[in-house]
Amino acid sequence: MNQVIHAAVRRDVARTEQALRALPDGDGSRARQIQSAWGNLVRELTHHHEAEDENIWPFLQERGYDPDLLAAMESEHVAMKQALASASTAIAAVATSPTSAHAAAAANAVSACSAVVNAHLDHEERDVEPIALQMEDDPEWKAMAKKLRPASIVDAANALAWMQDGAGERERSSLRATIPGPVVAILTRFVARRYRREVAPVWR
């Protein structure tokens, strides 16, 4: 599931930058669409990282895993939060005043954010995911992992819709291996109304 989430993050960051660079001068409607989709990405990524900070890193610390690695993960999360905030501010400026100059500045801010985000995701996939794979059958790990889920069924449905939007077959297969396909289909079609209404049209 972690790599499915990471793929969705990478995808949204990339297409946000592309959308900003292609934004016609003065197109406020499109700028607000981009801002809405970016806000969804920030919301999903914030939930993902707060869940890791509150659950995974303390769990691994108690198990005696490398404290320097865990400190690096937390530090990278702080850097990502700052980069996301800077990009959000720049995108808000475009939504308020959709000039080519503001769009270019926002695209550059998203590009800078992308470098921070991708460096962290690569680091986590390289050094933390192998640990997680080793612990898949650990009962305490399984109990902790339940705390990573979204707070409500609606939040879960919107997250699933986001993960699938633009996903390749590899990500979709991985998702179906974790959650039964019919469950994913029902939640995405009938419960994920916010995502389908507010975000999905941005990327069509």
Predicted regions and their residues:
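Small-residue-biased structural context
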Residues: 1-204
